[in-house]
Amino acid sequence: MKTYAIIEAGGEQLQVEPGRFYNIRHLSLRGVNFWGQNTKLLLYRVLMIRHQSATVLGNPWVQNATVKGRILDARRDDKLVIYKMRAKKKTRRKRGHRQGLTRFVVDAICLNGKVLLD
């Protein structure tokens, strides 16, 4: 059985495993480019941990559980095009939006101070 955790970050829930990278909504607590590369990241909103055959569920979060990681870079998602048109009225509006993302890699999943898997 593989070890993984389900976390809440950036308004969404992610199933994360150590050694893999993930994109979440941009972490801009203190400005756009405040978080640099290799900034350590501790995520405490862990909803569930699966380790070997044991499952630990939180209510709403697992006590004394953290996911350790580091930020790789800040990037932007693909452009989302919004096109509004009123038929027969010559009214058209085209706008685009690119969501800011933060890419981070998970280094370890910890429970009660012990690292479950590096």
UniProtKB/Swiss-Prot annotation:
Q: What is its main location?
A: plastid
The Gene Ontology biological process terms listed for this entry are: translation
List the molecular function annotations (GO) for this entry.
rRNA binding; structural constituent of ribosome
UniProt keywords (A-Z) are: Chloroplast, Plastid, Ribonucleoprotein, Ribosomal protein, RNA-binding, rRNA-binding
According to its record, what are the GO cellular component terms? chloroplast; ribonucleoprotein complex; ribosome
Q: Does the keyword Signal apply?
A: no
Q: Where do transmembrane segments lie in this chain?
A: none
User: What compartments host this protein?
Assistant: Plastid, Chloroplast
Q: Which Pfam families match?
A: Ribosomal_L21p (PF00829)
Which cysteines does the record link by disulfide bonds?
none
Write out the function statement from the record.
Answer: This protein binds to 23S rRNA.
Q: Which NCBIfam families match?
A: L21 (TIGR00061)
> Could you tell me which HAMAP family the record lists for this protein?
Ribosomal_bL21 (MF_01363)
State the oligomer form and interacting partners.
Part of the 50S ribosomal subunit.
Describe the family membership recorded for this protein in Swiss-Prot or TrEMBL: Belongs to the bacterial ribosomal protein bL21 family.
Q: Which named protein is this? A: Large ribosomal subunit protein bL21c
Q: Which organism is it from?
A: Zygnema circumcarinatum (Green alga)
Q: Which gene codes for it? A: rpl21
